[in-house]
Design a protein with these regions (language model features):
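N-terminal intrinsically disordered, cationic/polar leader segments
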Residues: 1-53, 57-108
Length: 108
């Protein structure tokens, strides 16, 4: 994957995550505020102040996620972002992390 392909893919992934969180917020399933700064998306859970931070790491061609449960790295393989340690998929993992931190069962 070229640098441009990675940057385009990372941008569309972050946009999709932000849109999904905004949709869940609009549907009153979870109370979050998303803040975007360049390649970093910060999701704050209003009820408890906890955060999930997602950013792209162009030199590594990875997406990184920081949450209360820890830090996670994802590489794009076979059309999805896969955790480099446990093989979990990014959106499934974010659903579980956001459910735990937000106190509601949600699916991105």
């Amino acid at each position: 994957m070229s640098d441009k392909e990675f940057l385009d893919l990372a941008e569309s992934t972050i946009n999709a995550i932000e849109a999904a969180m905004d949709r869940l917020n609009d549907e009153d399933l979870i109370d979050v505020e998303c803040k975007r700064s360049g390649n970093v998306l910060e999701i704050e859970f209003i009820d408890n102040g906890s955060k999930i931070i997602i950013n792209s790491q162009a030199p590594m061609k990875e997406m990184w996620v920081a949450a209360k449960a820890g830090g996670f790295h994802y590489k794009h393989q076979g059309g999805v972002w896969i955790n480099t340690r446990d093989g979990s998929e990014l959106f499934a993992a974010l659903s579980a992390l956001a459910s735990a931190q937000g106190g509601a069962d949600i699916t991105l």
